[in-house]
Amino acid sequence: MSSAVVSPVARLGPGVASRPGRRVSRAAKRHRLRASASVVVRQVAGEGDELVRKLKTCASVTAASFGPGRSDAVSVLDGLVRKIKYSGEAFVLLEAVEEDEEGGGDGACLGCADVTALPAFGPRASKEALVARVPMALGLTEQSNFAYLSGMCVDPGHRRRGVGVKLLEACESYARRMTPTPAVIALHVDGDNEAAIALYEGCGYVRVVEREVDDAFGRMSRAFGSLVGGGAKKILMHKWIKA
């Protein structure tokens, strides 16, 4: 979820990931948003042309959220198709939509997020460098599984309405229903995206480590539909969902 740059986030050194029960900072609590009752989050599903149409909508919203020069709808769409193809039932794409007058969720797409369940290690572990480092950063065991959240975005015209909160809550709910249940949800966020960091912290996510990441086209596309930047600093954040 993009925002104006206010000030850079201080570099964090590698550390041991905190366990459940860590207190959320007062600043994070002040940034917690009250979710709008008129927003519904649902899984993006379907077949054939119907599914393609829905994926294109999500791709367009994602591209608009990150802005010109950061992503484009075609690259985001390609990333989503790849995730569906290679991750199968371990992948879920969610969209936030506005309820219509009858209470149905058939309004405009306001935001998206996706979650992929991954083994911490082994032949089926992620091959994408950024994601592959998550298990070691969090101190996961060889038998552990984790959920990786990406593609989190809210349409610029619908921010500050609790859409992001509802998307995060839905991601956690779907992750808890995955088999085997992931021990933790992890995500990466740009170090200068203070609005997104505040949102995540307000929902219980904790920073782990910030590191330099090469955002060249192609490498990041495997993790998140081609974010084109230039040496952006990424902060790893996490939330334990299984004791």
Task: Please report, for each region that a protein language model flagged, where it lies by residue.
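Conserved beta-strand-loop-alpha-helix junction that forms the acyl-donor binding cleft
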Residues: S150-R159, A170-C171, T181-I197, R211-V228
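Conserved acyl-donor/pantetheine-binding loop and adjacent beta-alpha core of acyl/acetyltransferases
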Residues: E102-G151, D214-A223
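Conserved active-site tyrosine of GNAT-family acetyltransferases
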Residues: Y200, Y205
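N-terminal chloroplast transit peptides
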Residues: M1-A28
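Short hydrophobic/aromatic beta-strand element in the GNAT-like acyltransferase core
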Residues: F91-E95, C112, F146, G151, ...
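Conserved acyl-CoA
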Residues: L138-Q143, K166-V184
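Active-site rim helix/loop that mediates acceptor-substrate recognition in acyltransferases
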Residues: T62-G105, C109, D114, L118-A120
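A short beta-loop-alpha structural element at the N-terminal edge
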Residues: V40-C58
